[in-house]
C-alpha cells in the first residue's frame, strides 16, 4: 500500500509540474483528491487494512494529500501571476505616443457679456435681483404705468397665457417687486430672459436677454443717471468711449432718454456697424415716473429714482459685429468657437 501511495504522489507531482492553465489544475485535483479520486479511494478502503497498517497508511495518505494540495495552491498562484503579467504587457501604455487633446468648451458670448455687465454694476454697489419669467399682467404693464389700451399690450407684442398672465416682455417687473418688498434705498439690476411675439429674422427673436437697473433714494437726479450709465459704458467698451443722450419717451420714466455711444468698432469714424454715423444706440432710461413710485407705496415727494434698460443680445451683436441674432441661439460651434 505504501508503494501505491508513493506512486500516486509521484504521478500527481509530475502532472502538476507540467500544468499550463487553471483548468488542467482543476482536473488533476479531481483526479487525485476528488470524491472518486485515487487518493480518496485508498482512504475510504482503509477499513480492510490490519490494525497495524491502518495508522501508518492513514498518516502517509494524509501527508501526501496535504503535499498535493500545497503544490496545487502554489502552482495556481504562479499561473495567475503569469496571466496577469501577460495581460499587463499587452495593455502597456507607450508614454512616447503623443497625447490626445481633449476638446475644451467655451462660455457663450451672451453669458460672457452678461457676467461682465453684472461685475461692473456690482462693483458700483448694485445688487442683482431676479423674478419670475411667467408674470402677472399687473407687474408687467399696469404697475409700470402702461394702461389697459396701451399698444405694448397688443397680442402682436406679447405672449398671453390668459387675460392676467403673460410671459414677461421686459425685466422691469423685477423693479416693481423689489420696490414693494425691500427697504429703501434701492440700487439693483435685473438681468434675465424676456419674451416678445416676434417672427424670427436677422434682428428679431421671440426670446432674448435684457438687463435693467433701478436706483431709488432721496435726492436722486438725472445727473446721477448720466454719470452711472457713462461709467458703465466706459467700463464695458473702453475708457475713450464718448456718450450722448437724446430725449425719448417711456411710459415708466419721466423725463426719458436714449443713450448713444461712439461706435466701438470704428471709434466714431463711421462703419457698417454704426451705419456710417459713428454713434450706436445702446440703452434707454430716465427718472422713475412718480406714478410708478406711488404704485409701489413710495412717496414721490420724498424719494426719486432712475431706471434704465438695454438688450444684451443687441449689445453683443454690436460689440462683435454680428449681423444675425439667430447665430447666438443655433449652437453652431464654428461660430461660438470664435469667442
Curated annotation (Swiss-Prot):
Cited NCBIfam families: pheS
E.C. number(s) listed in UniProt: 6.1.1.20
Keyword terms: Aminoacyl-tRNA synthetase, ATP-binding, Cytoplasm, Ligase, Magnesium, Metal-binding, Nucleotide-binding, Protein biosynthesis
GO terms classed as biological process: phenylalanyl-tRNA aminoacylation
Protein family according to the UniProt entry: Belongs to the class-II aminoacyl-tRNA synthetase family. Phe-tRNA synthetase alpha subunit type 1 subfamily.
GO cellular component: cytoplasm
Signal peptide: none
Cross-referenced PANTHER family: PHENYLALANINE--TRNA LIGASE, MITOCHONDRIAL, PHENYLALANYL-TRNA SYNTHETASE
MF (Gene Ontology): ATP binding; catalytic activity, acting on a protein; magnesium ion binding; phenylalanine-tRNA ligase activity; transferase activity; tRNA binding
Lineage: Bacteria, Bacillati, Bacillota, Clostridia, Eubacteriales
Top-rank EC class of the record's enzyme: ligase
Cofactor field: Mg(2+)
Quaternary structure annotation from Swiss-Prot or TrEMBL: Tetramer of two alpha and two beta subunits.
Entry annotated with the keyword Transferase: no
Catalysed reaction equations from the record: tRNA(Phe) + L-phenylalanine + ATP = L-phenylalanyl-tRNA(Phe) + AMP + diphosphate + H(+)
Protein name per UniProt: Phenylalanine--tRNA ligase alpha subunit
Cofactor note text: Binds 2 magnesium ions per tetramer.
Binding residues annotated for Mg(2+), in chain numbering: 254
Localization per Swiss-Prot or TrEMBL: Cytoplasm
Amino acid at each position: 500500500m505504501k508503494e501505491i501511495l508513493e506512486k500516486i504522489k509521484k504521478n500527481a507531482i509530475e502532472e502538476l509540474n507540467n500544468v499550463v492553465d487553471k483548468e488542467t489544475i482543476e482536473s488533476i485535483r479531481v483526479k487525485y483528491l476528488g470524491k472518486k479520486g485515487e487518493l480518496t479511494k485508498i482512504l475510504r478502503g482503509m477499513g480492510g487494512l490490519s490494525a497495524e497498517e491502518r495508522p501508518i497508511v492513514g498518516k502517509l495518505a494524509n501527508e501526501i494529500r496535504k503535499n498535493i494540495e500545497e503544490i496545487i495552491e502554489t502552482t495556481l498562484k504562479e499561473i495567475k501571476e503569469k496571466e496577469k503579467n501577460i495581460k499587463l504587457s499587452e495593455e502597456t501604455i507607450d508614454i512616447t505616443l503623443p497625447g490626445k487633446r481633449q476638446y475644451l468648451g467655451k462660455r457663450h458670448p451672451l453669458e460672457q457679456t452678461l457676467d461682465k455687465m453684472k461685475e461692473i454694476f456690482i462693483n458700483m454697489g448694485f445688487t442683482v435681483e431676479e423674478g419670475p419669467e411667467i408674470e402677472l399682467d399687473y407687474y408687467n404693464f399696469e404697475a409700470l404705468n402702461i394702461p389697459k389700451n396701451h399698444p405694448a399690450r397688443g397680442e402682436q407684442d406679447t405672449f398671453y397665457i390668459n387675460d392676467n398672465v403673460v410671459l414677461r416682455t421686459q425685466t422691469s417687473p423685477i423693479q416693481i417687486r423689489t420696490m414693494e418688498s425691500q427697504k429703501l434705498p434701492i440700487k439693483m439690476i435685473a438681468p434675465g430672459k424676456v419674451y416678445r411675439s416676434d417672427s424670427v429674422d436677422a434682428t428679431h427673436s421671440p426670446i432674448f436677454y435684457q438687463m435693467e437697473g433701478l436706483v431709488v433714494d432721496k435726492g436722486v437726479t438725472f445727473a446721477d443717471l448720466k454719470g452711472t450709465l457713462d461709467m458703465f459704458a466706459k467700463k464695458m467698451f473702453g475708457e475713450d468711449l464718448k456718450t450722448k443722450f437724446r430725449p425719448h419717451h417711456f411710459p415708466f420714466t419721466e423725463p426719458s432718454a436714449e443713450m448713444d455711444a461712439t461706435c466701438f468698432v470704428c471709434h466714431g469714424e463711421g462703419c457698417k456697424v454704426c451705419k456710417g454715423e459713428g454713434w450706436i444706440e445702446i440703452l434707454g432710461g430716465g427718472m422713475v415716473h412718480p406714478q410708478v413710485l406711488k404704485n409701489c407705496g413710495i412717496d414721490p415727494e420724498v424719494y426719486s429714482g432712475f431706471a434704465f434698460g438695454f438688450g444684451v443680445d443687441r449689445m453683443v451683436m454690436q460689440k462683435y459685429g454680428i449681423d444675425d441674432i439667430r447665430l447666438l441661439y443655433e449652437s453652431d460651434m464654428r461660430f461660438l468657437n470664435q469667442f
